[in-house]
Amino acid sequence: MTSEVQTPECELFELELLGGGMERRYRRARPEVEAMPWGTLDPRPFSEAVLVAARRSWTSAAFQEHRTAAACAATLRALISARAPLDLIAGFARFPLDEVVHVELCARMAMELGGGTELWHEPSALCADADPSLSPLLQATELVTRNFCVGEALSIPLLHGTWLRATHPLPRAILGRIVRDEAAHGIFGWTFLDWALPLLPASGPSLIRRTAELTIAEIHKLWAEVRRRPPLAPSDGHALGWMGSEEYLQLAARSLQTRVLTPLRDRGIQLSSAFTSGP
């Protein structure tokens, strides 16, 4: 989580590369990072207000991808503890690396615009763990529901919509790379549930419903923050890689219905009406 008030637990969100052999192996594993058209974006045509908003947006995106990497790592451990099918685990195992790549892409995009903005966070609250009193299978179910059936499933159409609207080659290439990686993330939750549901105890569907509702409640809070943002000219936003607030919220509402609520209903999970409406 981020914090506007700096408490003793808060740390500045900063990133670094170790370099040397570790970086070379990383570059060989994911050469697409260096293949981006870095250095092609001239920030001078944009107003200071637009640039600051863009830097803040991409810094926040880097932090959110950092959080998602932590959530992926926690979910991977839960899948292994639950003895999920080996091919399911193997397919998932690349997701943490995908997210680390996305962290670097977003952070470097912020640097292209003049540098990241100050962001304080509590490392101990980076991502939520599963309820330790649950069985390994139910812990995995809780994390997959939160992070993939809701979180990743909802984020992918929003990323895709932003990619479609990005007009400059650099943010368009970055968003395109993220969208391609996230395609597998978006379907994983449903693949897992199709395997796990027949194995879950009677309390399993209720756990899925409660977890989805709590996650959507947090997303509704984020949407309320988006609604309060001052509007920027759509052309400016599109060039640097984001949507206007109203456009974003409309797409978010549609995506919640089609990418989250409908697949849950198809599997017999019906959420309370308070969680089925858009922003």
Task: Identify the residue ranges that each predicted region occupies.
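Non-heme di-metal
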Residues: 1-279
